[in-house]
Amino acid sequence: MADTEEAYGMPDTPVEAEPKELQCEPKQDNQLGASSKTPTSPPAAFTQQGMEGIKVFLHERELWLKFHEVGTEMIITKAGRRMFPSYKVKVTGLNPKTKYILLMDIVPADDHRYKFADNKWSVTGKAEPAMPGRLYVHPDSPATGAHWMRQLVSFQKLKLTNNHLDPFGHIILNSMHKYQPRLHIVKADENNGFGSKNTAFCTHVFSETDFIAVTSYQNHKITQLKIENNPFAKGFRGSDDMELHRMSRMQSKEYPVVPRSTVRQKVSSNHSPFSQETRNITGSSTLNSQYQCENGVSSTSQDLLPSSSAYTSLPHESGTIYHCTKRKVSEEPAEHSYKKPYMDTSPSEEDPFYRSGYPQPSSSSSSTTSFRTESAQRQACMYASSAPATEPVPSIEDISCNSWSSVPSYSSCTVGGGMQPMERLPYQHFSAHFTSSSLMPRLSNHAGTQPSDSHSMFQHQSSHQAIVRQCNPQSGLQQSSALQPTEFLYPHSVPRTISPHQYHSVHGVGMVPDWNENS
């Protein structure tokens, strides 16, 4: 591009222009009818034959003069930064039918390096070698003279960079050096281009547009002027000068920007959907990721959000982690010889006891498929045992439906001032309405019975259906309609304010006690 400048005789700097090249046309000013308020066009730095009548006026010259009096500074970054004030000009005197190319370049104003100290700029040394000059061609080029004279010609998209390997065509500058922008008007050739030796052109320089390139603003007065006049800096207005200066220096540095959606995804991924606390995730659609359980049941995060009728989980006090290992059973509910009705509380009640943290299956699927869990097997073993209490208690891992006789019954549960250490089989909280009187009449029917089926289970059905437990295949089948309301383990009328630390002694084994609302 430097060869291009030499081809049509562009001077390196405006100070090197010879006096004979500085031409001014007074009669053209009279023809334009410029008023006293409009500044006259400065003489062209370089003009060839046929380009004498072209006049250029700097837009917002008063604003440029304000910056020039203080010492204009322009931010340069690796990615490129636009100039403020923007370089805009009004061009007149062009041939309306001739095509022109308008372009800019920025050249060093001198061969010094500057520093800002004691609230002023001073020379600190010799300038660094200048980078090869780049030309910024206006996007509308080439265009007819009528097009250029119709409106302001703006170079606001021009960007300044300090990246010497910049591939985007930005103007490359060195920090702490003074530069002078220049405007070139070139008459397009027959190929709508320029660069040949016969190309006519003229160069216009406005001395009030020179500036020092910086990576952050040095003079707080420049910071204040930029904030007051730049419409994109209105967020900084209203603060004190030093704070504005500090913030502007911070804004000039390049920091990585993390998208909000990524942060929201990271925050939401740290919370399990099976937790006790209710969390409402209001992220974007990218948060609908799949959560896989051990049993192969998959659902989206929206399906796992707890609702008003959802169950809440209860943390295990013993510290043992129970995993959901639901297994399908091939038998139908009607094929079992003996079933004990067992009903859960209504999902509309917010009773925190014996609630599952996993989503309940739909009624259509639960009517044909039954599931059982390890916790249900442990409860069945706990209630069906009739062995004497003198036998040793096995560990939690050894308890299964094949060890009925080895598990002693819960003959009594006493809760004192503090919780006893859980050395044996951990128990779970029950309701405060346990009574021993209602248990004894029914205990005689099952005192001497031992279950022979090792596959007893809970029929895990929907929340509004009765959940039955298989106990003894020799006993008759009891229908849930023939049972009294006092025979359900969790009636719908259980109060919500039940203290988990109130118990009554249970003196029998093998059966779930009854209670009612008045007990």
UniProtKB/Swiss-Prot annotation:
InterPro entries, per the entry: p53-like_TF_DNA-bd_sf (IPR008967), T-box_DNA-bd (IPR046360), T-box_sf (IPR036960), TF_T-box (IPR001699), TF_T-box_CS (IPR018186)
Protein's name in the database: T-box transcription factor TBX5
Q: Report the DNA-binding ranges.
A: 63-238
Q: What is known of its domains?
A: The T-Box domain binds to double-stranded DNA.
Entry's localization field? Nucleus; Cytoplasm
Q: What is its main location?
A: nucleus
Gene symbol here is tbx5
Show the segment(s) annotated as Disordered: 1-46, 254-282, 293-312, 326-372
Cite the Pfam families for this sequence.
T-box (PF00907)
Q: Name one GO biological process term.
A: cell-cell signaling
- The protein's organism comes out as Xenopus laevis
MF term (GO), any: RNA polymerase II cis-regulatory region sequence-specific DNA binding
The annotated subunit structure for this chain is: Monomer. Homodimer (via the T-box); binds DNA as homodimer.
Question: Which residue intervals are annotated with compositional bias (Polar residues) in the record?
Answer: 29-39, 262-282
Q: Which PROSITE patterns match?
A: TBOX_1, TBOX_2, TBOX_3
Going by the UniProt record, its keywords in alphabetical order are: Cytoplasm, Developmental protein, DNA-binding, Nucleus, Transcription, Transcription regulation
The record describes the protein's role as: DNA-binding protein that regulates the transcription of several genes and is involved in heart development and limb pattern formation. May bind to the core DNA motif of promoters.
Q: Basic and acidic residues bias located where?
A: 17-28, 328-342
Chain intervals with Low complexity compositional bias: 298-309
**Listed GO cellular component terms?**
chromatin; cytoplasm; nucleus; protein-containing complex; protein-DNA complex
